[in-house]
Amino acid sequence: MELNFEKPLSLLTLDEIDQQEGGVIQSFRTGHTSPYPDPADWLNGEEPPPGVFITSVEKVLNWSRHYSLWPVMFGLACCAIEMMCMAASRWDLARFGMDIFRASPRQADLMIVAGTLTWKMAPWLKRIYDQMPEPKWVLAMGACGTSGGLFRDSYSVVPGFNLVVPVDVYVPGCPPRPEALMRAIMDIHEKIDKTRILKR
């Protein structure tokens, strides 16, 4: 059954549209029940034609996540300046697919936390982390982010972001250079490539 385009869509009632769409869906269900053939059967030992590749859904999803990281910036101190340098034209962050920093954590999958975190600010870091959709990664930037840095013994400083949120990659330095941050992003890429979607 095909959709009837003799009448303009604006003149059809919702019931008529639903009925026609239901018929098309039902024809797909009944007409396309044969299983997808094994590639070995239709390739006959030959190479696939140009433009065709065979892979798993897991690899495709990891590939797309690898090349489209959407970072949210949580800059707290001097390390954030180096993060801004990395986003400038000299280091060309766009080649990693993350040229636009997101304003909302709900649109991001990578949080780059840079600088000194105080206990008063820690609940806000956790709140932003909780607002990010899965899968999500956290990159701790600088000595203050990894261990508290120069202010470690202060009563008000969190000695490492891992006490508040799970951290995937640490970037040492005070402040770390943009090259170190780019290396950490490549480490995140490697971690994404090894992510298992289906548990076996």
From Swiss-Prot:
InterPro entries membership: NADH_UbQ_OxRdtase-like_20kDa, NADH_UQ_OxRdtase_20Kd_su
Q: Any idea which UniProt keywords this protein has?
A: 4Fe-4S, Cell membrane, Iron, Iron-sulfur, Membrane, Metal-binding, NAD, Quinone, Translocase, Transport, Ubiquinone
Write down the membrane topology: Peripheral membrane protein
Q: Which residues cross the membrane?
A: none
CC per GO annotation: plasma membrane; respiratory chain complex I
A Gene Ontology biological process noted in the UniProt record is:
aerobic respiration
Transport recorded as keyword: yes
Looking up Gene3D superfamilies in the UniProt record yields: 3.40.50.12280
Write out the GO MF terms: 4 iron, 4 sulfur cluster binding; iron ion binding; NADH dehydrogenase (ubiquinone) activity; NADH:ubiquinone reductase (non-electrogenic) activity; quinone binding
Write down the chemical reaction(s) this protein catalyses.
a quinone + NADH + 5 H(+)(in) = a quinol + NAD(+) + 4 H(+)(out)
**Highest taxon of the lineage:** Bacteria
Primary location recorded for the protein, binned into one broad class: membrane
Report residues binding [4Fe-4S] cluster: 78-79, 144, 174
**Disulfide bonds listed in the record:** none
| Enzyme class per UniProt | translocase
Q: Where in the cell is it found?
A: Cell membrane
* Family from the record: Belongs to the complex I 20 kDa subunit family.
Quote the subunit structure annotation: NDH-1 is composed of 14 different subunits. Subunits NuoB, C, D, E, F, and G constitute the peripheral sector of the complex.
Q: What is this protein called?
A: NADH-quinone oxidoreductase subunit B
This protein's species is Dehalococcoides mccartyi (strain CBDB1)
Lineage of the species this protein comes from: Bacteria, Bacillati, Chloroflexota, Dehalococcoidia, Dehalococcoidales
Which gene is transcribed and translated to give this protein? nuoB
